[in-house]
């Protein structure tokens, strides 16, 4: 699973996920299913935001090839993927600027058009069940919830799906592709079955014990079969801006 994740996802997604897991004392090499789940969730958050802007009249527009002369602002602020301190700093800044109610938990996005925080969910289970779990945890009508599944289903607060149908279809297609590729490699069952995942976790722990201190050699080559999985949703300018925004505070 770890090899699949590193080949399947954008390197920046992988890097941010590793930092997030280490912040909570988790090891991507051991908890590989969680590694895959967090990478998937983070990519969906980026896809949700990509190409969506607000123009000088505060109207929402979609731009896939940037016009440098256009006065555009990204419609969504991406909060997911930042360390906790920086995430709360962004949330507090948004609340102070807009006057919206501060959430109890760190949300994933902020929508400048609708003036609301958004909680994104990606589930391997039934969307209604996961939606209720999210709603019960958040306990706030102010935070909008949008759930996606690997089977193409979705559910959102008051059936308000925020994005246009084409943008949501890109996300659903990507999730379905990830599912199919996992299944073709025999990874899907352990990804969705907690009992099988627990068995795999024990296996990972056992395999790491004898050689924990040995250096490892990592191959960054992408197999031909996985080249079709390379995410195409992030333009180079957006990637550079996001990398600078998320990672500049790592250096002292």
Swiss-Prot record:
Gene3D superfamilies: Influenza RNA-dependent RNA polymerase subunit PA, endonuclease domain. The active site is at residues 80, 108. Its main location: host cell. The record marks 195, 198-199 as: Important for efficient shutoff activity and nuclear localization. GO terms for molecular function: RNA binding. The keyword Lipid biosynthesis does not apply. InterPro entries: PA/PA-X, PA/PA-X_sf. One of its GO terms (biological process) is viral RNA genome replication. The record marks 202-203, 206 as: Important for efficient shutoff activity. Keywords: Decay of host mRNAs by virus, Eukaryotic host gene expression shutoff by virus, Host cytoplasm, Host gene expression shutoff by virus, Host mRNA suppression by virus, Host nucleus, Host-virus interaction. It is found in: Host cytoplasm; Host nucleus. It comes from the Viruses. Belongs to the influenza viruses PA-X family. The probable endonuclease active site in the N-terminus and the basic amino acid cluster in the C-terminus are important for the shutoff activity. The C-terminus acts as a nuclear localization signal. The C-terminus is recruited to host protein complexes involved in nuclear Pol II RNA processing. Plays a major role in the shutoff of the host protein expression by cleaving mRNAs probably via an endonuclease activity. This host shutoff allows the virus to escape from the host antiviral response. Hijacks host RNA splicing machinery to selectively target host RNAs containing introns for destruction. This may explain the preferential degradation of RNAs that have undergone co- or post-transcriptional processing. This is Protein PA-X. The gene is PA.
């Amino acid at each position: 699973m770890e090899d699949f994740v590193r080949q399947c996802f954008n390197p920046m997604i992988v890097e941010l996920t590793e930092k997030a897991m280490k912040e909570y004392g988790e090891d991507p090499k051991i908890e590989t299913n969680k590694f895959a789940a967090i990478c998937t969730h983070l990519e969906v958050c980026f896809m949700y935001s990509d190409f969506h802007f607000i123009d000088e009249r505060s109207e929402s527009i979609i731009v896939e090839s940037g016009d440098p002369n256009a006065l555009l602002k990204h419609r969504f602020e991406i909060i997911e993927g930042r360390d906790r301190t920086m995430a709360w700093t962004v949330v507090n800044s948004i609340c102070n600027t807009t006057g919206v109610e501060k959430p109890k938990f760190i949300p994933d996005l902020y929508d400048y058009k609708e003036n609301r925080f958004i909680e994104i969910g990606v589930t391997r289970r039934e969307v209604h069940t996961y939606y209720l779990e999210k709603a019960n945890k958040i306990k706030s009508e102010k935070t909008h919830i949008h759930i996606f599944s690997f089977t193409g289903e979705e559910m959102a607060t008051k059936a308000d799906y925020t994005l246009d149908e084409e943008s949501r279809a890109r996300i659903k297609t990507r999730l379905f592709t990830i599912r199919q590729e996992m299944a073709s490699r025999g990874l899907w069952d352990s990804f969705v079955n907690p009992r099988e995942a627990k068995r795999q976790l024990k296996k990972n722990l056992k395999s790491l014990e004898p050689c924990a201190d040995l250096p490892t050699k990592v191959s960054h080559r992408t197999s031909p079969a996985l080249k079709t999985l390379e995410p195409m949703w992030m333009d180079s300018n957006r990637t550079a801006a996001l990398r600078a925004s998320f990672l500049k505070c790592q250096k002292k």
